[in-house]
């Protein structure tokens, strides 16, 4: 499913969002990458909340990060799945929350007139407003961006069916982890973003993916973070868990160039097949 050109969309500027950045053993990476990107796009530092694993990490981050470049540091829990759950329970239900990784190097946007049909993203604030507005339009809570920074595969469309919502940058109306509409992740590490995509889709009947913007990041290669725990076995275990627990949506994909096992998402209960 898609919607027409972005040119017809009006932009609201009133979304009271926060940006939650979980980070582990990457204080310098966060300082030099994601925080610099947010500064470049004129994001209010008071909106930026950094979630660390323990008190020791908290002190390291306070000593490393530039004062005034973020709002606050919150001590959460180790491992990305439990930390995502901690973040969901930290904020009020319905709060607009951006989840952002600590190693984002930038963003590109689709432009059919540009070389490779892509250019540097003009406005991150507009993308954030677009995402939350599309969620309201389609009565769902999770939105994300295109996972691959390659204009050849991107387009000026918005998806609202089952799509993989990449974990490095996405937004949601905070669901919490409790109650019939809560979203609680079971996976602690690898493929937690696939699990989140499926759980939101199952709860809401749709997720939003903006095809016209993508992140620049180092998947599977940046030291620290998930790489502290990741092995090919852990990635395979996560992929197999997805197929076992969401057989109506998930299929194992062993053909990715990364060399790591991946998951393909499609709602198999529907007749029409679309690429993820």
Give residue ranges: language-model regions.
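Well-ordered, non-membrane alpha-helical segments in soluble/globular domains
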Residues: 31-36, 117-132, 232-238
């Amino acid at each position: 499913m898609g919607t027409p050109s972005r040119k017809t969309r009006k932009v609201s500027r009133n979304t009271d969002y926060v940006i939650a950045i979980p980070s582990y053993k990457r204080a310098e990476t966060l300082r030099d990458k994601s925080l610099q990107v947010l500064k470049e796009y004129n994001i209010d530092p008071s909106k930026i909340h950094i979630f660390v694993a323990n008190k020791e990490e908290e002190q390291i981050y306070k000593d490393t990060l530039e004062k005034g470049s973020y709002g606050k540091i919150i001590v959460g829990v180790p491992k990305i799945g439990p930390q995502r759950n901690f973040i969901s329970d930290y904020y009020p239900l319905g709060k607009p929350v951006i989840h952002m990784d600590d190693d984002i190097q930038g963003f590109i946007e689709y432009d059919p007139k540009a070389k490779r049909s892509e250019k540097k993203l003009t406005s991150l604030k507009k993308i954030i407003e677009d995402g939350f507005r599309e969620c309201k339009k389609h009565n769902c809570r999770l939105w994300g961006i295109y996972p691959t920074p390659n204009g050849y595969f991107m387009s000026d469309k918005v998806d609202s069916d089952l799509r993989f919502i990449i974990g490095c940058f996405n937004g949601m109306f905070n669901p919490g982890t409790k109650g019939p509409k809560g979203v609680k992740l079971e996976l602690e590490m690898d493929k937690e973003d696939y699990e989140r995509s499926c759980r939101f889709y199952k709860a809401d009947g749709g997720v939003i993916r903006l095809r016209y913007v993508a992140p620049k990041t180092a998947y599977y290669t940046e030291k620290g973070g998930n790489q502290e725990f990741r092995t090919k076995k852990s990635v395979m275990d996560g992929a197999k868990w997805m197929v076992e627990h969401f057989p109506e949506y998930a299929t194992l994909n062993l053909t990715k160039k990364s060399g790591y096992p991946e998951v393909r998402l499609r709602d198999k209960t529907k007749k029409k097949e679309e690429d993820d």
